[in-house]
């Protein structure tokens, strides 16, 4: 449900964990985000760093339908990386770039509530599906010009759950009534035969998933984009850092025109 406290233009940015291993990428991301007005909300993943720590803790990473299977060891690794090293790295870069930023997780103040995620490909372990977002927590920060930097560890009835960062970003964008949610990846958009599709609708996305053109980790991104659209977000975009301000693939509802 959209919080009526603020109706200034709202942007949610999700950045993948793999990209955050690159110090140059983090510095440039922080520079761009720090200059944005109104200030955005930032959601981040953990990427390879989670898998490396998980292996160090004695558990081999595995994925089900493009989503990380999360047993107790994997959850510990995700918490340590997402709420620890990655969050600190991003917040530090933003502050150095001149912004005010605060790192929080979906557990803090019960920001993101979840239920166990069911998946047709099999059991995902402690992976959660967002059911509620306390948007007023984010508005409190945004209204004081503080960028929320959100780690996708969320709260279920029986404790913390790992949440796919794309799904978390979509749920947050929906709760904020965001004008746009931007998924920043290592590719310039949704590719079809090597070319970036400038615009896609739900029908086109479902067709591209069915024929295998959209696969792997791109599926949660487009699904999260569609969920956000269903909840009232005007548009979603998938792009890379270079295209973050205006390029990439725009995903829109059927029949809409996004300017």
From Swiss-Prot:
Gene3D superfamilies hit by this protein: Acetylglutamate kinase-like
MF GO annotations: acetylglutamate kinase activity; ATP binding
Protein name (Swiss-Prot/TrEMBL): Acetylglutamate kinase
Residue(s) at site: Transition state stabilizer: 14, 221
Taxonomic classification: Bacteria, Bacillati, Chloroflexota, Chloroflexia, Chloroflexales
KW Iron (keyword) present: no
EC number: 2.7.2.8
Biological-process GO terms, alphabetical: arginine biosynthetic process via ornithine; L-arginine biosynthetic process
Highest taxon listed in the record's lineage: Bacteria
Pfam families documented for this protein: AA_kinase
